[in-house]
Amino acid sequence: MGARASVLSGGKLDKWEKIRLRPGGKKKYRLKHIVWASRELERYALNPGLLETSEGCKQIIGQLQPAIQTGTEELRSLYNTVATLYCVHKGIDVKDTKEALEKMEEEQNKSKKKAQQAAADTGNNSQVSQNYPIVQNLQGQMVHQAISPRTLNAWVKVIEEKAFSPEVIPMFSALSEGATPQDLNTMLNTVGGHQAAMQMLKETINEEAAEWDRLHPVHAGPIAPGQMREPRGSDIAGTTSTLQEQIAWMTSNPPIPVGEIYKRWIIVGLNKIVRMYSPVSILDIRQGPKEPFRDYVDRFYKTLRAEQASQDVKNWMTETLLVQNANPDCKTILKALGPQATLEEMMTACQGVGGPSHKARVLAEAMSQATNSVTTAMMQRGNFKGPRKIIKCFNCGKEGHIAKNCRAPRKKGCWRCGKEGHQLKDCTERQANFLGRIWPSHKGRPGNFLQSRPEPTAPPAESFGFGEEITPSQKQEQKDKELYPLTSLKSLFGNDPLSQ
């Protein structure tokens, strides 16, 4: 880390740490941002040592700038960091990243005007391509530098690790900046596997070449002396043209950018391959119930990059589907933010969704709702007994304990009626009859008991055998009539054992 952090020192380091990441924000640049930028440059096969000078930063910006429109957020962050570092090296005072980008744009406009003025002074109104790998040597001739093994190695690693995921396209665009058709074919030939994808790419290139030939027919007649022939589709693809012809077309007046044209054809084919390797539609990207919002956004934008649509359509997809396909928890939060919320605000608001604390809160709310629903259902069915009955002591009459645990002196007599001679279990006060009704004590015994027992007032008449003989059955019937009036319950219970 020490070598990477030594890019700035002294006063430059102080200026660096005073620049804010965003206008009005609290966070400022630190050494860790330079270390991160160095590692990212190594990923893109660029020399991290270029960060030590303003000219090196300018070269890095020239390589990254063409891929900004189609690049990832990491690529844009890297570009912003290098632009800010360039301003620090040049001694330009800036307060934040936005101001550094504006200063950088002003510098580029000034350099373009100077180049145009110099070309006008020399009588050459055309801008000669100075892009790598076509450079101008000391003699003023345009020569070609072969693509470096380091660049090829970076391209092969991307294919091996990412296959043909959407991020392969901006990586290819960055690595092939200013390349000739021969260099582009070298990059494609280094891909060992995925031959089915390579065959699809060849078919797309052939289709684009045929379309070029249809739109640019060959002029009849011989070619004028000192004039170059016009490139055909196969010439642009590098199959029927030499390296010298390709350089001549790219540096002629006016130039024919055969390298850029061929590069566009390859990107069209790569888009088809990416769509084949990523068959998931953006409409199918939905956030799982426990998936963090950050992972959902990553999957969404990765699939969105593979979609073959205009930028306006992609913007509409982002504004609509990103919120619509979120899970219910995040969707509630995102709708509360409003339609003008930025992606940063969305990710900050949904940061805790799906975590342990959020799960506990959701579970507590669900349990509370379930308890309330069960209570409501019980009350509607009439099964709700309400609060439990308060325990009351029979001995002292106080609440909160039972007579077995009572410390007061033992009450004498029955705990129900207060009379002595029997206990509570034998008390006949307020006993229910067979109908479940309480028979008041002042009305005598309950209705299912014999109300009164007839007591004889005179001895029974002796039978001397005179008159009709009374049979035992007749005696029993007569006895029943005396004991049981018409309102008796004998019909229900038979003979009352108390009467025998």
From Swiss-Prot:
Keyword terms of this UniProt record: AIDS, Capsid protein, Host cell membrane, Host cytoplasm, Host endosome, Host membrane, Host nucleus, Host-virus interaction, Lipoprotein, Membrane, Metal-binding, Methylation, Myristate, Phosphoprotein, Repeat, RNA-binding, Viral budding, Viral budding via the host ESCRT complexes, Viral nucleoprotein, Viral release from host cell, Virion, Zinc, Zinc-finger
Zinc finger feature spans (CCHC-type): 391-408, 412-429
Extent of motif PTAP/PSAP motif: 456-459
Sequence segments annotated as region (Interaction with host PPIA/CYPA and NUP153): 189-227
Species whose genome carries this gene: Human immunodeficiency virus type 1 group M subtype D (isolate ELI)
Motif Nuclear localization signal boundaries: 26-32
Chain positions covered by the region annotation Interaction with host AP3D1: 12-19
Chain ranges for the short sequence motif LYPX(n)L motif as given in the UniProt record: 483-492
Domain notes: Late-budding domains (L domains) are short sequence motifs essential for viral particle budding. They recruit proteins of the host ESCRT machinery (Endosomal Sorting Complex Required for Transport) or ESCRT-associated proteins. p6-gag contains two L domains: a PTAP/PSAP motif, which interacts with the UEV domain of TSG101 and a LYPX(n)L motif which interacts with PDCD6IP/AIP1.
Protein name: Gag polyprotein
InterPro entries: Gag_p24_C (IPR045345), Gag_p6 (IPR014817), Lentvrl_matrix_N (IPR000071), Matrix_HIV/RSV_N (IPR012344), Primate_lentivir_Gag_pol-like (IPR050195), Retrov_capsid_C (IPR008916), Retrov_capsid_N (IPR008919), Retrovr_matrix (IPR010999)
Presence of the UniProt keyword Magnesium in the record: no
